[in-house]
Each structure stands twice: as structure tokens, then as C-alpha cells.
Design a protein with these regions (language model features):
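Charged, terminal alpha-helix-loop-beta segments
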Residues: 1-220
Length: 220
């Protein structure tokens, strides 16, 4: 069942039993050119993480299109902002990704944990002829590793207690920076190598997401 080719009434009437709940459903096919242009204008200013979060909170359809980067979400998408994966306790801090994201296609539902960083940040540093992660990107990667590990160890709790139906084996996504840093050949090649070798945690710039959004909203 694909929302882009089905009436809204039929879509919700025939909601598949294995899909997540309807409350967090977001229709990525409702993303508009106006939303895209507003988001592009924002990213062009290299905003802080908080500014990006504020925009996406009011433009969920734009963020839902991140699932298209992984060839899913065409049937339906779901967004869970600031959802606890682990509640805080006396000896441990709570674990809250910026978003839990789900996308459905003909193969089923795929899950992701998303960490946002500012478009003003870089993912990589190139000095002394070596490329390595910036402190901001490294923090984001470590956060995603924790989220994925907790998700793997607590799947039953997350599915049953906080109603993440079907939640399993999420991939991590770090959104950070723009493609300006990839103008450096070494950085571009290192980033490409990272994403090839680390399929569980992918690093993308906001420009990459913008291209995906632009392609999705083009008239067919």
C-alpha cells in the first residue's frame, strides 16, 4: 500500500497490522516546494542545531524525506522526536536521540536513529595530511553508537512499553554541516570511505538531504 497512489481514507482504513502507530505517521509526499525553498534558505545561512530543530518541528514532511536516502519511506514514514530510549536513573543519564525515524516500503519497515548537528559545523578536519572527525562529529557518532546499542539490548521494552511497534536493528544517521568541506579531495574521499565501511552509521550533510527533497517534490 502506497500513500501517493491511495486516497487518505483508504490508506488509514487498510493500515497494515505490522506497521507502527498512526499517531506518529508523517506523509513525506506532502512536502512542498515552499517548504523545500525555506529549508534551503535556512541551510544556506549555516544555522545552529537549535535553528534547524525549530524548523523541522514545524515542517515534519521535509524531515520524513530523509528515509528516501535509504530507498524506503515511499509507502509511509514515522517521526518520534525526543523519544527516550532509556529513562534517567540515579547512576545513569537518559538517552534521547533527536529523532527516531521509520520508513516503509514493499520490503517492510526500516528504523533509524537520527542525530542533528548544526549546518555551521564540519564533520571532518584535514590537517597534517590526515583526515579525522571533528569533536562535534565524534560526539554525534558516539551518541549514535549508544542509541543503537541500547536499541539492540532493549528491543522488547521499546516495542511493548513505549509502543515502537516493530522497532528493531536501527541504523544511525548523523546530519551535520554542508558540502563545502567536501570540496577538499581528501575529506570527500574519507567521507565516502566512511559511509561505505560503516553501513550502520552514516554521515550526511544537509545539502545531501536537500537534493533528496528536491528530487522527491519534482513533478513526475
Amino acid at each position: 500500500m502506497k500513500l501517493s497512489t491511495t486516497s487518505k481514507e483508504d490508506f488509514f482504513k487498510h493500515w497494515p497490522g505490522h506497521w507502527p502507530d498512526k499517531d506518529n505517521f508523517v506523509n513525506p509526499h506532502k512536502a512542498t516546494k515552499e517548504q523545500y525553498l525555506a529549508f534551503k534558505g535556512l541551510i544556506d545561512q549555516k544555522p545552529l542545531e537549535t535553528e534547524i530543530e525549530a524548523f523541522l518541528k514545524d515542517n515534519k514532511e521535509i524531515l520524513a524525506l530523509i528515509t528516501f536516502l535509504f530507498s524506503t519511506g515511499h509507502h509511509a514514514s514515522w517521526l518520534y522526536p525526543k523519544q527516550y530510549l532509556r529513562l534517567p536513573a540515579s547512576s545513569t543519564s537518559g538517552k534521547i536521540p533527536d529523532y527516531i525515524v521509520a520508513g516503509a516500503n514493499s520490503d517492510g519497515v526500516s528504523w533509524f536513529v537520527l542525530e542533528l548537528k548544526g549546518a555551521n559545523e564540519n564533520a571532518f578536519i584535514n590537517n597534517s595530511k590526515r583526515v579525522h572527525l571533528t569533536s562535534v562529529a565524534n560526539k554525534g557518532i558516539c551518541q549514535l553508537i549508544e542509541y543503537i546499542d541500547i536499541s539492540t539490548r532493549s528491543q522488547s521494552y521499546l516495542r511493548d512499553e513505549i509502543n515502537l511497534k516493530g522497532y528493531r536493528e536501527p541504523k544511525g544517521i548523523l546530519l551535520i554541516g554542508t558540502e563545502e568541506e567536501s570540496e577538499n579531495t581528501q575529506v570527500r574521499e574519507f567521507k565516502s570511505a566512511w559511509n561505505r565501511m560503516n553501513s550502520r552509521i552514516q554521515i550526511y550533510s544537509y545539502n545531501r538531504l536537500l537534493r533528496t527533497i528536491e528530487n522527491a517534490i519534482k513533478p513526475s
